[in-house]
């Protein structure tokens, strides 16, 4: 059984993945709980909740399964929903304005806001730097749509480029270690097992170190 879009909860107690068309949630004792049928993508886990995309909207469901709640009602392409570290907000990429932009929702109030107005051909939410800043990847400051850089956008819409160079994904551990994935030449169907010069690379910087 193959798996795609794997995401591990921050407390390491659970992870979600999509084997073919049926998404499962696995807890650390190995129990697999089927969530629902349908074309579901991009799961992310926080505590006892899983967020995912389906039917051109963002949905929320308990880790234990049950009725999923639709968080958006826009019926446009969405991808990469990500919980904030404290679990109170979710950021995602939405094509509501024809171009991919960063949106955020407050789970307590249901308030949904658009954070970026960049107009780039590609722009994908990566995660959160902290509870106030969303990390995303975008080529909006280059003339090459395939050359994306990593940015943060604050909850009031202020965008800053991170100093890691070109990148499409980022992970920062609690002790400050950093992993950056450089842009690749296309989707995985084109670069799977590819070892040429345009293959993506993973750069690692240990905690308290200055160089990758």
Report residues per predicted region.
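A flexible loop/linker signature enriched in serine peptidases of the S9 family
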Residues: 53-59, 73-78, 93-103, 111, ...
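Conserved beta-strand position repeated across blades of beta-propeller domains
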Residues: 44, 82, 126-127, 171
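Short coil/turn segments that connect the beta-strands within blades of beta-propeller domains
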Residues: 47-48, 86-88, 131-133, 175-177
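A short helix->beta-strand "capping" segment at the edge of beta-propeller domains
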Residues: 24-38, 68
């Amino acid at each position: 059984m193959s798996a795609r879009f794997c995401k591990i909860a921050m407390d390491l107690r659970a992870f979600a993945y999509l084997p073919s068309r049926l998404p499962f949630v696995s807890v650390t004792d190995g129990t697999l709980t089927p969530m629902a049928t349908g074309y579901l993508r991009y799961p992310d886990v926080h505590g006892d909740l899983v967020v995912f995309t389906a039917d051109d909207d963002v949905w929320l469901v308990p880790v234990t399964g049950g009725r999923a709640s639709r968080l958006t009602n826009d019926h446009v392409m969405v991808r990469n929903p990500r919980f904030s570290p404290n679990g109170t907000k979710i950021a995602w990429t939405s094509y509501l304005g024809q171009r991919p932009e960063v949106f955020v929702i407050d789970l307590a109030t249901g308030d949904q806001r658009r954070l970026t107005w960049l107009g780039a051909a590609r722009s994908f939410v990566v995660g959160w730097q902290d509870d106030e800043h969303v990390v995303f990847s975008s080529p909006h400051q280059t003339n090459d749509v395939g050359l994306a850089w990593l940015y943060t956008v604050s909850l009031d819409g202020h965008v800053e480029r991170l100093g890691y160079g070109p990148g499409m994904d980022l992970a920062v551990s609690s002790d400050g270690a950093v992993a950056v994935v450089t842009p690749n030449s296309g989707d995985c169907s084109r670069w799977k097992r590819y070892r040429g010069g345009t293959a993506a690379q993973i750069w690692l910087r240990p905690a308290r170190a200055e160089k990758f």
